[in-house]
Amino acid sequence: MDDGKRGVVCSDTWGIYEAMVVCRQIGKHRAEKATLTDYYGARSLDKVIHEIHCDGHEKSLADCEYKLADRHGVACSKPVNVAGVVCTSAKLPDLMPNLWALQHSLRIEERPLHALTCAMEENCLSSSAYTARSYGSNSYSGSSYMFGAPSYGPTRKLLRFSSNIYNNGTADFRPKQHRSSWEWHSCHQHYHSMSAFSHYDILDSHGNRVAEGHKASFCLEDVECTWPRTKRYSCRGFSDQGISVGCADVYRSDIDCQWIDITDLQPGAFVFKLNVNPELEVPELNYDNNAAICELTYNGYSAKLSDCSLARG
């Protein structure tokens, strides 16, 4: 800090945005990860700062919001609260959702609950679906209409959309987990290499979640590539997974779990949010384009996305 004090930052909210500021401040290229450990030493140094928050664009920690320690000679209360960073000069990926594909793929579909077995296993439906299955009744009506014909029994109303996620960075996007930790999904017959590759949410004007979104685990592969790039990663068998530079992974609106369950949502105006790499497990060049945020208009029968823009997740 400006007063020249030597000590440590203690925080249980230390993250990649704070690490980005530190790496910039010490003249390094980019942040690879933020650490909370005394593995690198400094356990016995005085606590100088705590409860720090940065947005990642500051030039130094002094520009962030923080609280100074009110006493001298006090160390971090726990070794796991000692903040550290790992900087890198390596190339990094940069994920970005395709706004056009998202807007133009939006549609509503009603499906009987008995046809959503795999989706229920992967927790892709709102909690009322599991109650409906348990009691054998529809949470909002005794019957519904699909394609002009009555469909009796529990049904769900699904807001479907496509996710086209491009890698515009300088390195391939690879899952953090080693392949030995990948999860086999018997319903879809492939491995998921990331437990939460994207989040889907519907929010009200106050930022409160009004429809139960979900964390979508994914099998990552190259589906589309710009010339002269070629596909490298595949979901077949136990192949390497990832998204190559200049390529995109595409999850079409007709694929299981490419939806938000809006069975319990009342008509109105909302905010739709799709966020990729939401837990920042994989370092990127830029996090300010990871989310697609749109205005959602829903009248109970149809829905429309408008004014979509890229933002930080």
Language-model region placement:
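Extracellular/luminal regions of secreted and cell-surface proteins that mediate adhesion/ECM remodeling
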Residues: 91-313
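Typically disulfide-stabilized, N-glycosylated extracellular/lumenal ectodomains of secreted
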Residues: 1-91
